[in-house]
């Protein structure tokens, strides 16, 4: 039986920290679905289609990653995709409390859905898409934190 995992997030935009998590997940699971949430309440900078396209290009070198957009409840999406593992990145202790709430709710909605928490490599443990966008808005150099295609797209958006 194939081990299918979902790595959900807004990915607005996908960062090297996200890539670190998804790359390591590909070594643990047979198939990893990078599930990009529509998240209209977060007012993303990039459209869902743009975020999917950016993530597809950034993960093209990973053979067992599928990138899809979604707007459904995570438990329903996981059930539809026949995945019973959720991958979540934990950067700091502050992330854990929120992630624990999500994990418990997801398990309530789909009892066989397990949450697996991965800590990013030290190099990426302090970055977030929001922080990268904020630094870029103020002309800070964020090249190191983004895949090349994503960096170019961010610079184009900020023009």
UniProtKB/Swiss-Prot annotation:
Which residues are marked as site: Transition state stabilizer?
18
Name it: Phosphopantetheine adenylyltransferase
User: What PANTHER family does the annotation carry?
Assistant: PHOSPHOPANTETHEINE ADENYLYLTRANSFERASE
Q: Where does ATP bind?
A: 10-11, 18, 89-91, 99, 124-130
Note the Pfam families from the entry. Answer: CTP_transf_like
Main enzyme class: transferase
Family named by the database record:
Belongs to the bacterial CoaD family.
Catalytic activity, reaction form:
(R)-4'-phosphopantetheine + ATP + H(+) = 3'-dephospho-CoA + diphosphate
- The record's EC number reads 2.7.7.3
GO CC list: cytoplasm
One GO MF term on file is: pantetheine-phosphate adenylyltransferase activity
The Gene Ontology biological process annotation of the record reads:
coenzyme A biosynthetic process
The protein's required cofactors: Mg(2+)
What does this gene product do?
A: Reversibly transfers an adenylyl group from ATP to 4'-phosphopantetheine, yielding dephospho-CoA (dPCoA) and pyrophosphate.
Instruction: Output the SUPFAM superfamilies linked to this UniProt entry.
Output: Nucleotidylyl transferase
């Amino acid at each position: 039986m194939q081990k299918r995992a979902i790595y959900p997030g807004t990915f607005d935009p996908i960062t090297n920290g996200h890539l670190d998590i998804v790359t390591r997940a590909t070594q643990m699971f047979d198939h990893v679905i990078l599930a990009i949430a529509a998240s209209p309440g977060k007012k993303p900078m990039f459209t869902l289609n743009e975020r999917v396209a950016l993530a597809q290009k950034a993960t093209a070198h990973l053979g067992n990653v599928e990138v899809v957009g979604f707007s459904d409840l995570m438990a329903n999406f996981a059930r539809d995709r026949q995945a019973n593992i959720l991958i979540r990145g934990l950067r700091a202790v502050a992330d854990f409390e929120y992630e624990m709430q999500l994990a418990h709710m997801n398990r309530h909605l789909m009892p066989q859905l397990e949450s697996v928490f991965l800590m990013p490599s030290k190099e990426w443990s302090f970055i977030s898409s929001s922080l990268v966008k904020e630094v870029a808005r103020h002309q800070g150099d964020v090249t190191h934190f983004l895949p090349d295609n994503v960096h170019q797209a961010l610079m184009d958006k900020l023009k």
